[in-house]
Amino acid sequence: MFDNDRPQPEFVDPKIDKHTVVALGNDHIVTPIKMALSDHLKEEGYQVLDFGTYDNTRTHYPMYGKRVAEAVADGRADVGIVMCGTGIGISTAADKNEGIRAAMVGDVVQAKYAKRELNANVLGMGGIVLGRDFIFYIADAFLNEKYQPTEENKKLIKKIDNIAKPNPNQKDNEHFFDEENKKWAEGVYHD
């Protein structure tokens, strides 16, 4: 799995908080990987809220990023994990929600940094780019890392959080994506 010429990452010794609730969301491209991650997290003792999608029917990823982000922002979940093919689109969608610090990562070092230094509350990954086992490894590292507050990173986080502007038309609006869903059904969007 790893290039032997490079330093090997430490394997995480899970110290699971059995009360941690993880919200999951994905697009249709990575549903099997998300389902496997859900099973893995449950086996590790996490409570999982799965916001879909649940099959391989073509869908539009922003709505799933939004659902996960809202669950984290309103306290139904402690953290979120979102995935699409590359991780970029769904992570960006999640990050557009007030109170969310989403980090799209490609390795364990980035995942741990995002949690430890920036108190990221949504982890984004590319299911096709990374693959199932590496996703498990990254998710475990993120979930086991603890935020380590410093005066400097508290100031940075405050600045980041102040960027997000409340959008009353967006929050908890089940019809927010109606126009995009109609266009999707008409074939305007494609993979």
Where are these regions (language model features)?
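Structural motif
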Residues: T57-K66
